[in-house]
Amino acid sequence: MLCIGMMAVTALVLQAQKPALDHSVYDDWKTLSRPSVPYDGPWMYYTVSPQQGDGVLHVVNALTGSEWSCPRASDFKISLDGTKAVYKIKPKYQETRQARIKKKKPDQMPKDTLAVLDLKTGAVEKYELLNALYVPFELADWVAYTKHVEKKDSLLKKEDLIVLNIKTLEQDTLKTVTGPVFNRTGRQIAYVCKPGAKDSLRRAGMCLYDAAAGVTDTLLFADKKAQLGKVYWNEAGDRFAFYANLDTAKTAAKQIDVYTWADGQVSKVLDHGHASIPEGWKLSDNPGLGWRFGDQALTVGLCPIPMEKDTTLVDFEQPQLDIWTCNEDYLQSVQKLRAGTEKNRTYLSLLRLGDGSLTRLADEDLPEVSVPLDFQGDKLLAWTDKPYRIRQQWDTDPCHDVYLVDLRDGSRTLVATAVPWTRISLSPDGGCYVFYDAVKRCWMAYMLADGRLTDLTSGLGVNFFDEKDDHPCLPPPTGGATWFKDSRHVALRDRYDIWVVDVTGKDKPYTMTEGRGRAEKTMYYVNLPYSRPQYFPRPTVIDPAQPVYFMTQNEVTKQGGVAVKDLSRRRSSLKSLVQGPYKWDALCISTAPKKPVLYYTRESFESGRNLYSTTDLSKEGTLVCETNPQIRDYNWGTVELMKWTRPDGIEADALVFKPEDFDPAKKYPVIFYFYEKDSQTMYSARNPAPSRSVVNIPWFVSNGYVVCDPDIYYKKDGHPGRDGLESVMAATDELCKNAWVDQAHMGIQGQSWGGYQVAYIITQTDRYAAAGAGAPVSNMTSAYGGIRWGSGIVRAVQYEQGQSRIGKDLWSGFDLYYDNSPLFFVPNVKTPVLIMSNDNDGAVPWWQGIEFFTALRRCGKQAWMLQYNREAHNLNGRWHSKDLSKRLDQFFGHFLKEEPMPEWMEKGIPATKKGLTLGY
């Protein structure tokens, strides 16, 4: 008994002695990639990467359990027969870092290496100085690559393509290659041979290399000045199409034609002078050529011939200005950001290879038309928001005109105007569209055969819109549509359950989840396991012959789970495989063993995100990878769900994070961090990491703080500031019922919308000893007409219908804009505040932070503002994030732990000392 007691005491002492996280731990904290299972073999692979440094890819055999590790691997691919793998080895992080410090030129920087891994023995063959790697979609025997050539007198040129047999390691070299493209099976490479001007031995042309035979065939000879474009293979890999301009005359420099190679022959299938190409228009090589209708047609792009620049004008004498007009679709700020896209915009046409006819499907009035890969019909729907683009400045609700486009002649029929259709999805057979009608708040089906429009969900007695949405606009649907393979049934999600609806109306709708979601207040989400990719990607469908998996989350407890239903059995019932205080994700199945092995990730705040395998999810899985075992070495933390009823009747939730060595007999400083609603993330893993904008919860908890993250509840009456205040104050009241809360040392922190709420709260109460406001809006009246420079759009829409939740324009709701603006109540502030407002913020105008700071300064308040140079809304530079982490630590440490005030807070950093000291 004495021994046991001493052991218990020792354990407690060891626990108490666990060190707190410090700012040096970030780089080694790792993330786990999604596991992947290629083809139908036994192999699974995943990558574990530190935040800064070199990651390791792990390849695991589901049959034998054997594992190979591949340091710094990327672009990893396993061969069809499962015997080899090909990948790039990136240079070591420190080597690249040192080269950057020494300011080496690009050609002197460390280079990638090509690696071929023998999955039987683990042996790796390496090929250094890799420039570019070309791997076929189905890796069988060959890959191709180019090298960085170091010596000018080398026989190998940088344009030379090396074809490598990964089984025999034999190589072949193809000279002066551009644009090589494997076909799907990896047996052939189509490429352009383009010798240099001084090379008199080789001719330019489109070539085809047969890897098995080692033979190159020049399919089309061309002048060295001719333009030969990228190759577009069909899915079978037995033909390809390409753009070319063989006319080297200057007058023809911008005209291209379309060619195909099929049945051993190259043919021009579309001439730039085709009668169906309107005057002033031309063929464009952007976005490319697409095979359709069983390889009997090609989608091609047309575009207006661009305006030529007047070269007689002197550049420096030309006015440089932007002209804003009220009748343009988009503001100049949007147009400038989209200028590159618009200059390259093309309009879809369909080329029938049988008769050479060209049908224009899209134009400037109906710019977005697409023909799905497997579509075999004559007509399809297309929609445009063009007539409603100006109103999108303030109206987020979906609005489109919908047309029925005839693929035979390009004619179009107006189906509906100004319709609020969204989440539009075409059935796999191309016969039916389903979409969500935001006004009717139901799912609809449109039959292409007869134009019949059917309401799919209004009569089901449940809502298919987000019942919790609290924005002043039409609520979005609770999810998208997932088609069944039969193109007749579609899966739709209400708040809790997954419904199966027959779009023909013959079968009665039913819940695939058997109503358990609503009965148990558990939300179900279809989670189809990772499946083999397709050469041309297609939407994922539900196959009734395969089990359907569901990720679940209980709305009350926030616990996650996994369920399954075997649709191949007539009387199959939903089976809950596992449920508990975790979040499950990333299902993938290796079907090579006799009993399929399922890989999945499981995570929680306490354990992190780890990888498991199992043949039976109802039993505890086998740990494949513990991503961050060092969690056990530090004073980590726990998370609890705090639930209570507010005085106004709202059933409220908040997450409460406590240190691992929490002692209820002690007093703890508290930081309230908030944004909107985060309680559903209770079981998400959280890594220590440099802050891009907000307090890092693991770090602060480990260092003796309690962190409370309350959900914010908005009442949709135009008072979001008050709603945030009431939500945070209510959570504070509830938490303060615990004697361990140090009520004299409580702080608040948030970023962006959270930063705004922090700014508002400190103008209404002095309850908090310190506040951190990242990228806050301080003056809604000036922010209303500001620009989100990252997208170019005006911010008005955010206030009238979006996150800022005012619900009115500035003039009809001026009192609301005034009442919700922290700037006008700055004289009330008593709380010291740290602001971050960066000068390249693309979301919140930088001057909003300046307005707030200068007002606080004018009113004699305690305030600091961090302005990271050339930084965005959330910090991108890791060195900046590390700096912010230290300053958040010191700021809250001073006011909530009574630690000494650092130099940067006491004296600032004068501009004359910028870059010389950080003032820590």
Identify the function of each model-found stretch.
Residues Y612:
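Conserved glycine-bearing catalytic or ligand-binding loops at nucleotide- and phosphate-handling centers
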Residues L448-F464, G505-A519, S568-R570, G580, ...:
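Active/binding-pocket-proximal capping segment
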Residues G459-H471, S618, C625-H745, Q749-Q751:
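Cap/lid segment of the alpha/beta-hydrolase catalytic domain
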Residues D385, Q553-N554, E603, Y673-K677, ...:
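Glycine-rich His-Gly loop
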Residues M1-P19, V777, G786:
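Bacterial Sec-dependent N-terminal signal peptides
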Residues S531-I542, Y634-G649, L916:
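Surface beta-strand/loop "capping" patches
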Residues A16-L598, E603-R609, P902, K907-I909:
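Beta-propeller folds
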Residues N687-Y920:
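Active-site-proximal cap/loop segments of hydrolase catalytic domains
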